């Protein structure tokens, strides 16, 4: 569940009324596992931006970053925007988050999530993290770089990852990162 300007009890009750099973997740008092739905966009709390699906391991990144209110944060490789939205939520309507990604398609995914969230201190921008812009030097209070990933962090949910990875793909990924 989002925290800023969202009543968790209302979000949870709404999901349960729709037949969604809601169970507390470990580590964070606002993290929940949800199941028992057929189509996530039909879940009212998702549609209204009260919740943002994200793996708990990804949510812990926002906790570790712990942005101060009023901060300017840049999230590189941000699609689909879960970590960026989490940072914006933690800023409690202050500061701003610039969610970047390399392709316009990914930026549009981020924008869809921003629009649904209703948060106004976040925007998406197409920008390649490999190209240094002198205007970016020493302007951000926080830079989140979840560089192009292997997906190993969520392998428990996406077991096909281990079958698609090859030694050559791993070597290429290491060089890119």
Regions found by a protein language model. Give the residues of each.
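S-adenosylmethionine
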Residues: 1-177
């Amino acid at each position: 569940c989002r925290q800023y300007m969202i009543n968790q009890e209302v979000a949870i009750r709404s999901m349960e009324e729709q037949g969604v099973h809601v169970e507390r997740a470990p580590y964070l008092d606002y993290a929940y596992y949800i199941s028992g739905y057929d189509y996530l966009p039909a879940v009212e709390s998702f549609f209204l931006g009260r919740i943002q699906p994200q793996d708990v391991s990804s949510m812990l990144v926002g906790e570790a970053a712990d942005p101060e209110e009023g901060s300017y944060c840049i999230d590189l490789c941000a699609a689909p925007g879960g970590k960026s939205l989490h940072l914006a939520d933690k800023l409690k309507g202050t500061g701003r988050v610039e969610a970047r990604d390399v392709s316009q398609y990914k930026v549009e995914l981020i924008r869809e999530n921003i629009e649904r969230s209703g948060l106004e201190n976040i925007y998406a921008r197409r920008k390649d993290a490999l190209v240094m812009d002198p205007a970016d030097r020493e302007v951000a209070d926080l830079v989140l770089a979840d560089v192009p990933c292997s997906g190993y962090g969520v392998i428990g949910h996406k077991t096909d990852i281990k079958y698609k990875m090859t030694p050559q793909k791993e070597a290429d990924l290491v060089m890119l990162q």
